[in-house]
């Protein structure tokens, strides 16, 4: 799973914007766009994004990992 792309997809499905997500996690909008390009992410940052979008990205990653094992 490309986590940055997954975050972007979930955000768009919810009708949220990069600007709103940036406000919710207290960072610059440009940083959000850089996150979308990453295939890995800091756990603390993912926790903040999960809270802001009310989505359990950790479960998504875990489910994908289990499917591979």
Regions found by a protein language model. Give the residues of each.
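A short, Lys/Arg-rich alpha-helix, primarily the initiator
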Residues: 1-20
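Residues within the helices of the helix-turn-helix
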Residues: 8, 19, 23, 33, ...
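Short, charged recognition helix plus adjacent turn
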Residues: 9, 14-15, 34, 59-69
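Alpha-helical residues within the helix-turn-helix
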Residues: 12, 23, 51
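Recognition helix of helix-turn-helix/homeodomain-like DNA-binding domains
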Residues: 26-41
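DNA major-groove recognition helix of helix-turn-helix/homeodomain DNA-binding modules
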Residues: 44-60
């Amino acid at each position: 799973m490309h986590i940055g792309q997954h975050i972007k997809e979930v955000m768009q499905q919810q009708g949220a914007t990069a600007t709103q997500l940036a406000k919710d996690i207290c960072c610059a909008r440009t940083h959000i766009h850089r996150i979308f390009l990453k295939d890995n992410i800091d756990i603390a940052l993912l926790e903040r994004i999960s809270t802001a979008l009310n989505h359990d990205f950790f479960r998504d990653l875990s489910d994908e990992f289990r499917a591979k094992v």
